[in-house]
Amino acid sequence: MSSEHKRSLPAVTLAAIGVVYGDIGTSPLYTLRECLSGQFGFGVEPHSVFGFLSLIFWLLVLVVSLKYLTYVMRADNAGEGGILTLMSLAGRNTSDRMTSVLVIMGLIGGSFFYGEVVITPAISVMSAMEGLEIAAPAMDSYIVPLSIVVLTLLFIIQKHGTGSVGKLFAPVMLIWFLTLGVLGVRGIIANPEVLQALNPMYAVRFFIEYKAVSFFALGAVVLAITGVEALYADMGHFGKFPIRLAWFTVVLPSLVLNYFGQGALLLKNPEAIKNPFFLLAPDWALIPLMVLATLATVIASQAVISGVFSLTRQAVRLGYLPPMRIVHTSDMESGQIYIPAINWMLYIAVVIVIVSFEHSSNLAAAYGIAVTGTMVITSILFCTVAVKNWLWNRYLAWVLLVGLLIIDVPMFLANVVKILSGGWLPLALGMVMFIIMTTWKSERFRLLRRLHEHGNSLDAMIASLEKSPPTRVPGTAVYFSRATRVIPFALLHNLKHNKILHERVVLLTMRTEDAPYVLNARRVTVEQLSPTFWRVIANYGWRETPDVEEVFQRCWQEGLTCQMMETSFFMSNESLIIGERPWYLRLRGKLFMMLSRNALRAADQFEIPPNRLIELGIQVEI
């Protein structure tokens, strides 16, 4: 067992390097340049270079190494991480009011991720392409078109899956990080005094010397840790130890060496501020480095796209987004999915961003507000989990929370002031997603409440039907029921209009549990309610896909035999109308109706054969 673990650990660690660290690993392309480019009033002078390097180093240590890898990754749901997972964990042992607050915070954090995911591919690929400004200045007008071409190809291949090319991600990213380290060492050797910036006093002196202006500089320094949420979100794919091992052995040393190498170059040649990353390389290596940087940024973009697919699936399964088509691109790996609607909406948004902002420096102002906002929420949710779930001492938890927020809040506020210069973009995108998620959840709850208002008792109705049965026809009928104790509307309408009932009636409820996976032993519960009525409850985790055929197989094991092609499936199809509401709630109702019209039908969700499906229309006022 241990030898197998030892053999697999290097492979899993290498895979983590290829997926988890793509975003944070491409930050050296633009971070130091943005810190010292002049927009904050800092010249390329020794004290500012030393100050920024010290800030970057200690952010990597305190935020990534300490906060996320040491503390936040302790909070897992059956091994899974991510902001929505943290939200669900935080709400388990709290009051209803507190749970509502935590849910809103979690949804805001998830919405911030949607805002960030539009910027990451754009700024990463454009930064790589901007190597042309150094390698071939005459071609700088092609940076935007080439960036769009590269990302177009990336979004096109999503539907085919990335399983085959994904095997190349880890080796390419390992080469990338080793290259970062080698380039950094090359710069440090030329000017080793730059290593003095490891001393945190340079960061302290930076704040003392520049006073209020240094606060705004945090808006640029945070670029060094964008992508930090991926460490936690991808925990379920690779495990805690491989992610930590990859960080401390490869990623952190490479990043620190490269940042300090760029700093050494700037101390020696302030003119290199134009693009210190590419100017760190010898002339003969510029084109190969640009190709490698492009590959690394494409991989970083792929990791972000995969992340938004996973987050969307989780939100759909937890009821915060409408059902949509989810394609599994791998028979072996459940995490490899493709969501066409999200893919193409994201592509259109990324292209618009590239065309509108034209240069990665313009996009840098938009980057950061979503990241730091999520960091603040993560700190609060984590400390809530520590107190409520793990029973930590409240005072120690408060001390930890204050310590985390002392770092998170100033960085968030420093990015808030950039709203007019681009920070509005992720905020606007995040707000749209927040409105969609809260609208779908609340209006869906309102709809279900209206559907269940008839108040008829299921047990009483079954007893009545058994005592005075209507005309019974041969076969099995399955009625989908959202609640276990409520009569399905399709059953009521079938009796009302057709006045018949099948010989066997199965009331099927599909549940999504607050866990990524459900044990097979708990998958299906079968309960016989009467000689001809059965209740079947199928439980799935949010990372799993409901499968009616699998449910039938497990029903057979429990003594209830159902054949897919010999069963009639009854569903209700709601036609929505908006009742009397204030104007703002009418707008929300119209948004819900639009989302409902475009949502994936339940029959398609469960892959029910069309010739076995009977839909009964009902009109519902919401």
Swiss-Prot record:
Keywords, sorted A to Z: Cell inner membrane, Cell membrane, Ion transport, Membrane, Potassium, Potassium transport, Symport, Transmembrane, Transmembrane helix, Transport
Major subcellular location class: membrane
Its membrane topology: Multi-pass membrane protein
Domain of life, per lineage: Bacteria
GO molecular function, one term: symporter activity
Signal peptide boundaries: none
Stored Pfam families: K_trans, K_trans_C
Disulphide-bridged cysteine pairs: none
Subcellular location: Cell inner membrane
TM region positions: 9-29, 49-69, 101-121, 137-157, 165-185, 212-232, 247-267, 276-296, 337-357, 363-383, 397-417, 419-439
GO CC field: plasma membrane
Reactions that this protein is recorded to catalyse: K(+)(in) + H(+)(in) = K(+)(out) + H(+)(out)
Function: Responsible for the low-affinity transport of potassium into the cell. Likely operates as a K(+):H(+) symporter.
Family: Belongs to the HAK/KUP transporter (TC 2.A.72) family.
Name of the protein this chain belongs to: Low affinity potassium transport system protein Kup
Species in which this protein is naturally found: Pectobacterium atrosepticum (strain SCRI 1043 / ATCC BAA-672) (Erwinia carotovora subsp. atroseptica)
UniProt gene name: kup
